[in-house]
Amino acid sequence: MYGIECTTILTFLISLILLNYILQLLTRIMDFIIYRFLFIIVFLSPFLKAQNYGINLPISGSMDTAYVNSTQENIFLTSTLCLYYPTEAATQIDDSSWKDTISQLFLTKGWPAGSVYLKEYTDITSFSIDPQLYCDYNVVLMKYDEALQLDMSELADLILNEWLCNPMDITLYYYQQTDEANKWISMGSSCTIKVCPLNTQTLGIGCLTTNVATFEEVATSEKLVIKDVVDGVDHKVECTTTTCTIRNCKKLGPRENVAIIQVGGSDILDITADPTTAPQIARMMRINWKKWWQVFYTVVDYINQIVQVMSKRSRSLDSAAFYYRI
């Protein structure tokens, strides 16, 4: 009995000694590897050059990250500002150096040379096809035109909000909208949209799926169409695909690095009437004007206040879309 107990104790002690030896050996090996690795890094670092590559997020993407400190003072020192204006403005001003003048005026407000870009567009309808909002902050000057109220409203809805879109193959599939945030957006030189709602047996409601002439025409020869149909109902869609593209889109929320300044007009376009705009708030500003020089002077004068209520390349579901009016 005594011999068995001694053997057990000796076996336990030998195991402890062996385990301790193994742990010490592993520690020395790890120290050797780590120190050698650090030595190689330190030795080679003066001879290596590396670049940190980031992800280039699209302007229409839903992955934009909010900048917490975007409202701090002097944010324009490291930011870019795009000011979009119609061709009419440059025609009326008729001065070959007017852009240089505007740049110098922006400099007095703290925007350094090279940070402000003046971009011209022909008209609202052509601008709506491809806005190209590339800057950290984008301000669009949009002159009020009573005949283009619907186009102005749709353009505002398009660029003041984030959209997640997928192409639609209308030749093969039926489509339905799931909720109020789900819209069909068409863009092109000429978009004519016709729809035929279907019942549960995929038969047309008030139309024949085999006869496009019986479809309901919801848009005719437009450049931008944001179309809303009855939710939860399949539709057969007909579109002039040769001159127009159509996408199934979901409104994600306001795009806070874009502002629209409505120039003139007795009416103010209210895009907050759309139930998908939450909360139901709009920020507006208004002044009297007669010349485009007055418009640009006002924009320069108020630019820092405008930018302070925007967010640099961000999207927030807790803030409203920004719509300004001169």
UniProtKB/Swiss-Prot annotation:
Signal peptide limits: 1-50
Keyword annotations from UniProtKB, A to Z: Calcium, Capsid protein, Disulfide bond, Glycoprotein, Host endoplasmic reticulum, Host-virus interaction, Metal-binding, Outer capsid protein, Signal, T=13 icosahedral capsid protein, Virion
Pfam families: VP7
Residue positions binding Ca(2+) 2: Q177, D228, V229, D231, D301
Location of this chain's protein in the cell: Virion; Host endoplasmic reticulum lumen
Region CNP motif, annotated ranges: 165-167
PTM comment text: N-glycosylated.
Disulfide-bonded cysteines: C82-C135, C165-C249, C191-C244, C196-C207
Record has Calcium as a keyword: yes
Glycosylation sites: N69
GO CC terms, sorted: host cell endoplasmic reticulum lumen; T=13 icosahedral viral capsid; viral outer capsid
UniProt binding sites for Ca(2+) 1: D95, G206, T214, E216
Molecular function, one GO term: metal ion binding
Region of interest: GPR motif: 253-255
Record field: transmembrane: none
InterPro entries the record matches: VP7, VP7_1, VP7_2
Family: Belongs to the rotavirus VP7 family.
Function summary: Calcium-binding protein that interacts with rotavirus cell receptors once the initial attachment by VP4 has been achieved. Rotavirus attachment and entry into the host cell probably involves multiple sequential contacts between the outer capsid proteins VP4 and VP7, and the cell receptors. Following entry into the host cell, low intracellular or intravesicular Ca(2+) concentration probably causes the calcium-stabilized VP7 trimers to dissociate from the virion. This step is probably necessary for the membrane-disrupting entry step and the release of VP4, which is locked onto the virion by VP7.
Subunit structure: Homotrimer; disulfide-linked. 2 Ca(2+) ions bound at each subunit interface in the trimer hold the trimer together. Interacts with the intermediate capsid protein VP6. Interacts with the outer capsid protein VP5*.
UniProt miscellaneous comment: Some rotavirus strains are neuraminidase-sensitive and require sialic acid to attach to the cell surface. Some rotavirus strains are integrin-dependent. Some rotavirus strains depend on ganglioside for their entry into the host cell. Hsp70 also seems to be involved in the entry of some strains. In group A rotaviruses, VP7 defines the G serotype.
Identification of the protein by name: Outer capsid glycoprotein VP7
Lineage start: Viruses, Riboviria, Orthornavirae, Duplornaviricota, Resentoviricetes
